[in-house]
Amino acid sequence: MYGYRRLRSPRDSQTEPQNDNEGETSLATTQMNPPKRRQVEQGPSTGAKKPSISGAPHLNSYQSLELPQNQQDSGTEELMIVLEQGTEVRLSLEEVILILAPETVLQLTLENTVLVIVPEHVLRSEDGLQSPVQIQYIIPSVDDFSLEFHAQDGDISDMRRENVPFSPAEEGKAAPLYQQPLMIPQANHMAGISPSFLVTPLCIPRCRAAFPQCYPLPPTPSPVGRPRPADSSFSLHGMELLCTSSLRPMPPSPSPGPQVYHRVHHRPPSRARRCLFRK
């Protein structure tokens, strides 16, 4: 009949709260244990993936000279060249010649030799280079500098054979400016490089005149004009020869007059000559 409403049994009224409790329990479990799916973070508007950017190196970060593990042995020779601005290094590899003028630190491995080219402005800066040794200057006697690599024994030599390293200063004597070692702060000390490496640093100056000479010449005094004494003044006007002198002035030479040229008349040959020499 219309308007009839079925009464709920006590069993149904007990089942409904139980279902509600199960729904709340499943929702709490879902919040505590989210599904193991890779969720991609999306932006609020574009929906693009948000990249993870690692910290970029600072401009003043140290540049280390750490070598690979297979090269860190006692037989490895390390050759360091310090370049000034505007200079270059020519490396001869048999039939190939490389011209190197880097703006930053450049490291080359040639057989058992490690060639490190360091610009001077990088080495002079406080945060430019890490090195466990003190660098000494070697000033070449020529402006251009060339190296030759021998593929047989793996050695690098100077092609001109004119660059000799300066000996360190003796105790009690101050070394000249160009012989003093380039001190590197202790903060730049880096572990991991064996001190047994043979480090031969070279400095190639662009203008050798900027470095002081080994034996400086004494300064040349500038000439200063001195006044002439009054008794030393003389004049050449009015000087005459003495009468007792054996020298006499020569008479003045006569002025050359006009030259007279006489006219020569040519007469015909005589008849007798014609008769004697007949054809």
Curated annotation (Swiss-Prot):
Pfam families: DUF2476 (PF10630). Residues 1-60, 247-270 are annotated as: Disordered. It comes from the Eukaryota. Residues 15-33 have a biased composition (Polar residues). Belongs to the PRR23 family. This is Proline-rich protein 23D1. The lineage of its organism: Eukaryota, Metazoa, Chordata, Craniata, Vertebrata.
